[in-house]
């Protein structure tokens, strides 16, 4: 046992936590070291090395699941306290800092074992193309899905039974003691059963486990897709009917009653898969997409029940048509429309005009749902009438204008890919008068006084304040209502899109 600890100590001092996976697995007992060193003093050095960049000696907080600072002194004291304590209540009292550090230790210890395997699998099958921008999802849908009609809408439940997570982790972690500790923490925690808890620090640990569970399902689906659809799609426009060809052969060979072959060459189906948080979308582009979607619905239910050993509620998975049921994702409402394109076909001595009808994606701004979200945030009432933002009346004028300016910019750029942007003018009206009422309430004056001071059109053309960039007066009229453009620099979801995701009436179209 001392040899194992010495090996771990050397790896922790030289390579950090990344060296844990480099231990030789020549014997059976070397695979069961995780729980043994979990609360030892040697783990202090390993954790410290994982947070420090060896080249620049700076703190590194990019470990999966940890986005805040880590107190190593408290970690050191916690290890000593765990050695002296005889009661396990210190591990599972969620109101104490000790329990928080235990969860952080579990995330750090399981991160190099669970997370890199997913990356290795993704690199081996070469399935993912990494995009940092959220708006890159929509050009991908427009470019890849040529003839969309039906799609599979799946809602993955947030509440997963603890034993399901233990069963999945058992395939990657061979340490039985570590799994027992993980099981004990999951069963004694109430926050895991309530995923919408306000305690963000506690939810980080369960979010890490939930993401790992979801990724396991994803890679199972990818493996099935690789087995079923083995060939690459060769795009072509025409279908070859062999009937006329057989008739010509009949006239040459003079065979009696040949049986014409009416087989039609069809291109292979393409599967497009998009997931945003717990919202999963599956689209099949090809012939017979409706039958294929129904088959994949049954297959997904069977996979969920066999792999996770739990029953998926059928109401969470449904087959929808893009023409009748628009696709709602990331705060956008997408539907298909027929675009008529006029083309000219030129022959040797004449030319003809014809039309080509193609289906394309079109985005709509969910105005009704956005107004309800703004009403919850205190910018307007439920009918869309602007009100004063009372929580901002204690701020300075520059800060109030800057916040409204930033929100308007984010909303405009986030919904710049929609076909019809007339709904943005209604949001502009709400923010304009809400900002004016907030400033008037702060100075105990009227809106007319605010307009005299900053101008009646200040919400569209803010005065240049120190540290505040003004919005150009033609920003909202620069592009036509039908012209779309995607901002590929957006890396975070708009806060209104997050509110729409939680809203029940997300499919309301304004």
From Swiss-Prot:
Which keywords does this Swiss-Prot/TrEMBL entry list?
mRNA processing, Plastid, RNA-binding, tRNA processing
> Per its UniProt record, what InterPro entries does this chain match?
Domain_X (IPR024937), Maturase_MatK (IPR002866), Maturase_MatK_N (IPR024942)
Q: Where in the cell is it found?
A: Plastid
GO CC, alphabetical: chloroplast
Q: Could you tell me the Gene Ontology terms of the biological process aspect for this record?
A: mRNA processing; RNA splicing; tRNA processing
Q: Name one GO molecular function term.
A: RNA binding
Q: Which domain of life is it from?
A: Eukaryota
Q: Which family does it belong to?
A: Belongs to the intron maturase 2 family. MatK subfamily.
Enumerate the HAMAP family for this protein.
MatK
Q: What does this protein do?
A: Usually encoded in the trnK tRNA gene intron. Probably assists in splicing its own and other chloroplast group II introns.
PANTHER family in the cross-refs? MATURASE K
Q: What is this protein called?
A: Maturase K
């Amino acid at each position: 046992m001392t040899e194992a600890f010495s090996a771990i100590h050397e790896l922790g001092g030289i390579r950090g936590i990344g060296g844990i996976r480099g231990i030789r697995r020549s014997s059976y007992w070397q695979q069961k070291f995780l729980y043994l060193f979990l609360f030892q003093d040697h783990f202090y050095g390993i954790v410290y090395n994982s947070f420090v960049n060896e080249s620049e000696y700076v703190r590194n907080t990019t470990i999966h699941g940890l986005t805040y600072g880590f107190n190593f002194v408290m970690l050191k004291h916690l290890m000593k306290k765990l050695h002296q304590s005889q009661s396990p209540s210190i591990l599972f009292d969620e109101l104490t800092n000790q329990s928080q550090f235990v969860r952080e230790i579990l995330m750090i210890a399981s991160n190099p074992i669970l997370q890199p395997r997913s990356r290795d699998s993704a690199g081996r099958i070469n399935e993912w193309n990494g995009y940092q921008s959220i708006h890159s999802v929509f050009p991908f849908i427009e470019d890849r899905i040529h003839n969309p009609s039906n799609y599979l809408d799946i809602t993955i439940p947030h509440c997963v039974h603890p034993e399901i997570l233990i069963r999945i982790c058992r395939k990657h972690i061979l340490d039985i003691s570590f799994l027992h500790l993980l099981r004990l923490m999951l069963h004694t925690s109430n926050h895991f059963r309530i995923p919408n808890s306000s305690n963000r620090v506690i939810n980080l640990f369960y979010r890490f486990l939930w993401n790992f569970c979801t990724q396991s399902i994803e890679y199972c689906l990818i493996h099935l897709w690789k087995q079923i659809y083995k060939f690459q799609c060769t795009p072509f426009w025409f279908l070859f009917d062999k009937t006329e060809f057989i008739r010509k052969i009949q006239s040459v060979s003079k065979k009696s009653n040949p049986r014409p072959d009416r087989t039609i060459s069809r291109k292979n189906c393409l599967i497009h898969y998009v997931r945003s948080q717990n919202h999963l979308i599956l689209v099949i582009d090809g012939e017979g997409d409706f039958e294929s979607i129904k088959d994949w619905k049954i297959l997904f239910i069977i996979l969920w029940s066999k792999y996770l050993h739990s029953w998926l509620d059928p109401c969470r998975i449904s087959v929808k048509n893009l023409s009748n049921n628009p696709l709602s994702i990331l705060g956008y409402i997408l539907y298909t429309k027929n675009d008529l394109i006029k083309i000219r076909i030129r022959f040797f001595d004449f030319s003809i005009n014809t039309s080509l009808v193609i289906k394309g994606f079109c985005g709509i701004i969910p105005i009704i749902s956005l107004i309800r979200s703004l009403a919850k945030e205190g910018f307007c009432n439920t009918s869309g009438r602007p009100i004063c933002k009372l929580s901002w009346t204690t701020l300075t004028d520059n800060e109030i204008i800057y916040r409204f300016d930033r929100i308007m910019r984010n909303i405009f750029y986030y919904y710049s890919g929609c076909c019809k942007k007339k709904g943005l003018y209604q949001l502009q009206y709400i923010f304009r008068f809400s900002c004016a009422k907030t400033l008037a309430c702060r100075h105990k004056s009227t809106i007319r006084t605010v307009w005299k001071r900053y101008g009646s059109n200040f919400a569209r053309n803010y005065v240049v304040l120190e540290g505040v960039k003004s919005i150009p007066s033609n920003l909202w009229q620069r592009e036509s209502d039908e012209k779309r453009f995607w901002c590929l620099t957006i890396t975070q979801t708009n806060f209104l899109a997050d509110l729409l995701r939680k809203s029940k009436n997300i499919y309301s179209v304004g």
